[in-house]
Each structure stands twice: as C-alpha cells, then as structure tokens.
Amino acid sequence: EIQSGIKVGLISDAGTPSISDPGYLIVKMCIDNNIDVECLPGPTALIPALAISGLPSERFTFEGFLPVKKGRKTRLQELSLEKRTMIFYESPYKLYKTLKDFYDFFGPDREISISKELTKIFENTKRGKIKDFLDSYENKKLKGEFVIVVKGLK
C-alpha cells in the first residue's frame, strides 16, 4: 500500500524512530523502493537528517561545520578512519568544496545523504555515493542549509 502513495507513520516507543532503533531498516527499505521519507522535526536538523538517511544510526558522531582552513585537512584525515556514521552541517557556498574534500579523503564510493532545508517547504534529501554528487553541485548557485550524513568506514 505504501508504494501506491498512501501516507503512513512510523512510531517508536523508544524515542525517534531509526535512531538506535531497528526502524532505520524500514527507512532504508523505503529508500530502496523509491518511497519518499519525511521526518517530523525535533530541536535540531541533525536527527531528522540521520533518521531519513538510510545509513546506520546506532552509533554516530556530530561534526557540525568543518574548519574552514586551519585544521581542515587534519580533521578530514582523522575522520577518514571513523567507523561511526558522521553528520556535518554545511552552507550552500561551501557544499561543493566539502563534497570534493570528502571525495579526496573518504573515497568516491562512500555512501552519503544530503538533506536541504529540513522541515521547510523546499525540503529535499538525496542519497548515493560521494562520486554521484560532484557534478550536480559544481558551479551551482545554491540556497538553503545542508546536512550531510556520511557512512563510517567499514
């Protein structure tokens, strides 16, 4: 019935569904079947972004905004070995540079989710591998704020 377009809700008795909860498997199944997933907002954008990413959520780290210059490469090198799912905030002006850095430090095939304007009218989430996003964000005039969720190292 979900594939026919009916709207359903996923409710957990243990907090936000799919955060340290097997509900993420349902979210992943929906994503794999091209079913849109939305999340009711909480106090921050990072939890809804993680909840709808389809990436492992039992252990994660919130990195916020990466350093702009000093320490950026060092931090990315450290994070390239991180096994937990990582969550980043990014501005529209630096999104392409950050994705390029992710490509260089994490590799082209690392799975990511990019959410834009969560809980707003132009909310959008795209999922794939880092290499899938470079062309789509190069030389684009973007608006809005982004949350990037990156799968940890296997």
Go through each PLM region and give its residues.
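Helical mechanochemical/support elements of P-loop NTPase systems and associated helical scaffolds
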Residues: 15, 22, 68, 72-75, ...
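Short, hinge-like loop/turn segments at secondary-structure boundaries
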Residues: 2, 26-29, 53-58, 105-106, ...
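Class I S-adenosyl-L-methionine
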Residues: 1-36
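Class I SAM-dependent methyltransferase SAM-binding "motif I" and its flanking Rossmann-like core
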Residues: 25-82
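Short gly/pro/ser/thr-enriched loop/turn and capping motifs at secondary-structure boundaries
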Residues: 17, 44-47, 120-121
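Short, well-ordered secondary-structure micro-motifs
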Residues: 21, 49-51, 73-74, 98-100, ...
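A contiguous loop/helix-start segment that scaffolds small-molecule binding in enzyme catalytic cores
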Residues: 3-7, 85, 89-154
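Structural detector of well-ordered beta-strand residues that form the stable sheet scaffold
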Residues: 11, 36-40, 87, 113
